[in-house]
Amino acid sequence: MRSKVAQRIQAETPQEVRIFVRQYTDIVLRINEILQAKGYTQKELAERMNKRPSEINKWLKGQHNLTLKTIAKLEAELGEPIIQVRRAS
């Protein structure tokens, strides 16, 4: 059972913040899933993308906001989709 403090904090957290945290978490989990499947380390990904390992680490720890452009670059480098959006028909 959650404490009253945790319940109050959750109740006071704006919906867009909850959505952001959920989506960011899903994206990071997907990136880590792809890295593991391909046998890549964060350092190897950094080298492949000409980035510092610390920058990759910040992306995957939520310390740096991932832009759509960054996600597209990650998808191109990893050869796998990270996010999927239903396309308009």
Q: What do these predicted regions represent?
A:
Residues M1-E33, K38:
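N-terminal flexible/basic segments that precede or flank functional cores
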Residues F20, R52, S89:
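Conserved N-terminal glycine/acidic-rich loop preference
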Residues L29-R48, K73:
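Short basic helix-loop element that most often maps to the first helix and adjoining turn
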Residues K38, M49, L60, E77-L78:
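Core residues of bacterial helix-turn-helix
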Residues G39, V85-S89:
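Short, charged recognition helix plus adjacent turn
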Residues Q42, P53, L68-I71:
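Helix-turn-helix DNA-binding elements, focusing on the entry/boundary residues of the two helices
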Residues M49-N65:
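Recognition helix of helix-turn-helix/homeodomain-like DNA-binding domains
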Residues K69-Q84:
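DNA major-groove recognition helix of helix-turn-helix/homeodomain DNA-binding modules
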